[in-house]
């Protein structure tokens, strides 16, 4: 006999957190504009994902064209740096991994200061592959120590940050 599907309550995001996220995305866009790089904001409505992939894929916020290199993707987050590091939601990371795999793109989290300061951190999605999941509250999370993230100042040129991010 087939078990009935149990619907989980949707996670409600605090409006203040939504506003901080929008401010972080705007700050990142202004920084990209100053770099004079081709980039696109990816519209986030549910209709921009094919029906069979809804709930399985997450779109990044920006696609950035690097002349002579190709396309990279950024998911911008307003993040608080905790003593243990940066905390990511496992379900969101898994959905971004699906995006990265299907589109053959390198995806970064651009973790901007939740208070609007110039300090930010880049975390390439694959840096989270070996991070153990830990339950916090009602969801599984990944905590990346801050020294494993790449510090980026929004006052420095994008090109310098990008070169550091791909250096071996």
Task: Indicate where each model-derived feature is located.
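Conserved catalytic cores of phosphodiester-cleaving nucleases, focusing on short active-site segments
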Residues: 32, 60-82
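Short, solvent-exposed loop/turn segments at secondary-structure junctions
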Residues: 46-48, 79-81, 114-116
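Nucleic-acid nuclease catalytic cores
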Residues: 100-128
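Charged, often glycine-rich, active-site loop that binds/positions anionic groups
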Residues: 49-62
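A structural signal for short, well-ordered beta-strand segments and their strand-loop junctions
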Residues: 41, 73, 108-111
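Mg2+/Mn2+-dependent nuclease catalytic core
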Residues: 79-102
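Acidic-basic catalytic patches of nuclease active cores, encompassing PD-(D/E)XK
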Residues: 1-51
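Intrinsically disordered, low-complexity terminal regions enriched in charged/polar residues
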Residues: 119-168
